[in-house]
C-alpha cells in the first residue's frame, strides 16, 4: 500500500488533547533553555516521555509552522487615506516581504485588499503581526486565508 501524504489542519488550541498541548510546552522549555533534557522538560509539564516522542515531530506552534512560508492575508478596511499604507509599513517593519497586493475599488466606504507576504525573514510571529494589523485605525478585519 502506497504511503499517503500527510494532511495538515489549523486548529484552535482549546480543542487539542492535553498530551499534545503539553508536548508543545515541553518543546518550548527545551527551545528556551528552561529545561536541558527531554526528561527535565516532560517532568516540568507532567507528561510521559512516550507521549512526548509520539507527538514532538508532528505538532508546532503556528508561528514556527508559518516561518518561511508565503501567507495570504485578506483585509477589510474603511475607505480613508493611509490605512493600506500603514498596514504595508507594519509588515515592512517586521521584515515581511510583500509579494503581491490586490486591492478592489471601495464600495460603501469599505475596501478589500489581499496581500501575499513572504515570512522567512520576519522578526515577529504571524499571530502577533495579525493582531497588530487588526488594531490599525481603519482596519475592520484581517484574516489569514492561505499559505504556500
From Swiss-Prot:
Protein name, as recorded: UPF0735 ACT domain-containing protein Dred_1164
Limits of the ACT domain: 72-147
InterPro entries from the UniProt entry: ACT-like_dom_sf, ACT_dom, UPF0735_ACT_dom-cont
Cited CDD domains: ACT_PheB-BS (cd04888)
HAMAP family xref list: UPF0735
Family under the similarity heading: Belongs to the UPF0735 family.
Listed SUPFAM superfamilies: ACT-like
Superkingdom of origin: Bacteria
NCBIfam families on file: PRK04435.1 (NF003361)
